[in-house]
From Swiss-Prot:
GO terms for molecular function: DNA binding; DNA-binding transcription factor activity, RNA polymerase II-specific; RNA polymerase II cis-regulatory region sequence-specific DNA binding. It comes from Pneumocystis carinii. This is HMG-box protein STE11. One of its GO terms (biological process) is regulation of DNA-templated transcription. Residues 142-153 have a biased composition (Polar residues). Phosphorylated by MAPK2. It is found in: Nucleus. SMART domains: HMG.
Length: 501
């Protein structure tokens, strides 16, 4: 029986030989009969049966015995119900029986390193007193608590066998449980992006960043480098109205940012020296043909959307200004309207494919100082070259002009709309009509840009021709450093050569 393994010192301290199974308890019961307080010892084994031990009686005065019994009943009742249920769940005790622990210490040894040295003047502490005693002990010994949480036995730093290094480690752990200071939290939240200043406040977005934020979701790719390159090309070819709209949005963003952060000042962070930090420089990514091919497809698709949107906006703008140049002078309205019909008829007849080239193309001027090409496409202004290798100017010009005959209306508009189109009042030297001559006249001016050389060379393999613009005509320069005018009617002899200085 488990009761035989119990050692007693008859003072109140009872310990089991196997402390992990120390579930047996020893209690005393006091019964008052006719002014005499009788005490009986009861042993409560693991199975919950009460075994009565030989009784012995102690005579106590009536008043003193009654007070002692009441104090014990009030102090032990809560401890009896909560303590056994918490520490010994397997123990089933009938609380209706008067079994009260009266020992000076707890009946079961705790495996926790916290040892409570209770005073003999308080034989049966209440639950509140136990909690207050535990809190005071933990506040006085935080190092032992940390050791108990980590699973290691407590170590006395002042004992001869105590290790100073261990105590220092435990103290450090105890200090780490303290709340983090505000300065440390602010350092952890320091900005790591280039768009933030040293104060942690982000800079206001500019017009391009706002444009990128809106267009990023419409690009069907997940590569950030490709997205950046595609949006950069889209931004370069975006319409002026669209760029102005995003510029206004950026201005409102700056005003909002200034109101929200009035004391904000951008302070860029200093770049770390790679030689001192020891980090290797960033490696360049290898070329991926499939990625470049997908990127080019997406770029073409997005640019087509931009060009289509640009052509629609231009069509709306021209629809509002339709025939406004004819109504500028009321007295010349009839003559200008008739000249407009004549030029459309001439251009329609001359733009038919398969017609032989004529050395004397039709030249019709309905506004003083304006000359027009046979198919109403203005000639580009190329930069002057020092030498052009074997260029047949007549055939080359004819090849350039007939290149537009093979274009559809949509391709013709896309080609023309890629360039800036000032109004008629700004430049009268570039007035032209659409290919079929069904819409209102459009003013197109192709500026002096080296990129314009690729416009015609992509359609037909013909060498580029350097042209020198003049007020009256266009002078072609050949490899012999002589030039002559291509348009007949100004000089009767087309072979007349004008020296170029």
């Amino acid at each position: 029986m488990l009761g035989r393994d119990i050692e007693s010192d008859w003072i109140g301290n009872y310990w089991g030989r196997d402390h992990s199974l120390a579930l047996n308890t020893f209690s005393k019961m006091s019964i008052e009969k006719e002014g005499v307080l009788y005490q009986k010892d009861f042993f409560v084994p693991y199975d919950g049966l009460v075994e009565e031990l030989p009784e012995h009686s102690i005579e106590i005065p009536e008043i003193m015995g009654q007070d002692l019994l009441n104090d014990r009943l009030n102090s032990v009742e809560d401890v009896q119900s909560s303590y056994y249920g918490r520490l010994m769940p397997g123990l089933n005790i009938d609380l209706s029986m008067p079994t009260f622990p009266v020992s000076n210490e707890l009946p079961v040894r705790l495996s926790s390193p916290i040892q409570m040295n209770l005073s003999t003047s308080m034989p049966n502490p209440t639950i509140e007193q136990l909690h207050s005693k535990t809190k005071s002990y933990v506040s006085q010994n935080p190092v032992n608590m940390v050791g108990s949480l980590s699973g290691s036995p407590p170590t006395d730093c002042h004992s001869p066998g105590g290790n100073s290094n261990t105590c220092g480690t435990l103290k450090t752990r105890a200090l780490s449980l303290s709340p983090v200071s505000s300065d440390t939290a602010a350092k952890k939240k320091s900005p790591s992006r280039s768009g933030s200043s040293s104060s942690g406040i982000k800079r206001p977005l500019n017009s391009f960043m706002l444009y990128r934020r809106d267009k990023q979701s419409s690009i069907p790719t997940n590569n950030h480098q490709s997205i950046s390159r595609i949006i950069g090309e889209m931004w370069k070819r975006e319409t002026i109205e669209e760029k102005e709209r995003y510029a206004e949005m950026a201005q409102r963003e700056r005003e909002r940012h200034a109101k929200e952060y009035p004391d904000y000042k951008f302070l860029p962070r200093k770049k770390k020296d790679r030689s001192t930090s020891g980090k290797s420089p960033r490696r360049r990514k290898t070329f991926d043909p499939s990625l470049e091919q997908d990127e080019s497809k997406v770029l073409r698709m997005m640019l087509n959307q931009i060009s289509h949107k640009k052509s629609q906006s231009d069509a709306e703008k021209f629809k509002l200004d339709q025939y406004s140049w004819l109504l500028s002078e009321e007295g010349n309205y009839d003559s200008q309207k008739g000249a407009f019909d004549i030029i459309c008829q001439a251009n329609t007849n001359s733009s038919q494919t398969g017609l032989p080239h004529s050395n004397q193309p039709s030249e019709i001027s309905f506004i003083p100082g304006i000359y027009t090409a046979p198919n109403s496409v203005p000639l580009p202004i190329f930069p002057v070259k020092n030498k052009v290798e074997k260029v047949d100017t007549h055939n080359s010009l004819d090849g350039y002009l007939h290149t537009f005959d093979n274009l559809s209306d949509y391709e013709f508009r896309s080609l023309i709309n890629n360039h800036s189109t000032p109004s008629v009042n700004d430049s009268r030297l570039g007035t032209s009509f659409n290919k079929s001559c069904t819409d209102s006249p459009q003013s197109i001016s192709i500026y002096d840009d080296i990129k314009n050389l690729d416009i015609f060379s992509e359609k037909k393999e013909t060498p580029n021709v350097s042209l020198v613009p003049t007020f009256d005509s266009t002078i072609f320069q050949d490899d012999s450093a002589y030039g002559y005018d291509n348009f007949t009617g100004i000089w009767d002899d087309p072979s007349y050569r004008l020296p170029v200085f």
